[in-house]
Amino acid sequence: MDEMLMITNYSDFLLRSILKKKVARDACLLPWALALLMVSACAAEKVTPSLLEIRPQHEKEWEANPRDVANVLNATAQELWIYFPQRKLPPINVVPKGGPITLFERGPNGEIQIKLNTGKTFWAQYAYQFSHELCHALCDCKPHENPNHWFEESLCETASLFTLRKMAGTWNTAPPYPNWKDYSKSLNAYADERIKLGKLPAGTSFPRWFADNERDMRLNSVDRARNNIVAGVLLPLFEADPKMWEAVTYLNTEKLTKLYSLKQYFEAWSRNSEPRHRAFIASVTKQFDE
């Protein structure tokens, strides 16, 4: 940070010095000084995400090389975590069996506890399940009576699709190991298969489909067929503006009762979010309007 401040201060001094001199004499230096200011400003604005500590547990149950397991889980998490520059999370304990689920209860030292249902070298399945559960942690999931919880489930399904597609691109150029480059195809294929499951019935618009299905989703939030369809609508929004993943931080800020409508739910989300997120939340809300 001190180096950034030194660069910025020097750039300011240089620009002031140039402007005090005759324009004709120093015109050749002015573009250079302006460019330096722009670079230093960008450097000052850049925020490095805090470290995310992921702890694979029950080593033998993974039936895979522990180092490989850790690499896959960390690679998965980073595709989302980079969009939370101000966020901090406690360590995350991950076990391969008993889920997939993110427990409301924390570990003995406040750790987030995630259970998957995977193992061996099914890396695409690791990524799919872990990114979904990590999204619940990022949404600050907690015990609730919220009948709109289906939206969080759909949002976390969106996170899985987003992560798989991002990882495929990353691994195609910078895999954890050089010989893992071809796994990028498996990641893409896994995402494509899930996206196909989320296709709307022919001739049906999403608002019409939602009007016909909302009641059932309020009664059963974990309905993967319906969650997939909602995720298919949300995915293009997040891929167009991935910085907006940060907005899920505020999804559960307000304690909601079982009487909340979807409109009230979105209003609470927007109200508790940062101003920079509200236009995006409005665009999400609009998808559900007839």
Outline where the language-model segments fall.
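Bacterial N-terminal signal peptides
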Residues: L29-V39
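Bacterial Sec-dependent signal peptides at the C-terminal "C-region" and cleavage site
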Residues: V39-V47
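Auxiliary, metal-adjacent structural segments of Zn-dependent hydrolase domains
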Residues: L52-T121
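Post-HExxH zinc-binding segment in Zn-dependent metallohydrolases
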Residues: H149-I195
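Pan-zinc metallopeptidase signature
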Residues: K199-E290
